[in-house]
């Protein structure tokens, strides 16, 4: 019985340790490590190889969307950020307009709304910067006022 309980505890602890997946994009200038933890998307680390510095974002949103719903009371803006979405899938991404860029696409779904979002990260072999873009879909009419990435 003690052996069974020990096995269950070990399996539980190892399951907790596997809840984060990391995705790395890298070239000679920089590396960006993106992490999905408990189905939430965030940048874990950005490494500037030329300056030999490492940035670990601690209190910034991966993105934010400010919008309103037409017909609602004026000055009724909503703001959603990465914490309001869960990651439903991840796949490698190659931008057809920039074949030299490689990266990942993260599909997200709103936790408490009917919004969906695809976040694209891409890095070309000679770029000293990483590109991030969003594709936002809503099942209701909204007025998108501001996007921060």
Language-model segment annotations:
Residues 4-5, 34, 134:
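Residue-level detector of intrinsically disordered/flexible regions characterized by low predicted structural confidence
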Residues 4-15:
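Sec-dependent N-terminal signal peptides
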Residues 8-9, 38, 138:
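A periodicity- and composition-biased signal for non-globular, repetitive helical segments
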Residues 15, 26, 125-126:
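A general, composition-driven signal for non-globular sequence regions
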Residues 16-20:
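Sec/Tat signal peptide C-region and signal peptidase I cleavage site
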Residues 21-107, 111-113, 120:
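Acidic-aromatic substrate-binding/catalytic surfaces of carbohydrate-active enzymes
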Residues 104-149:
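Acidic, contiguous internal or C-terminal segments within carbohydrate-active enzymes
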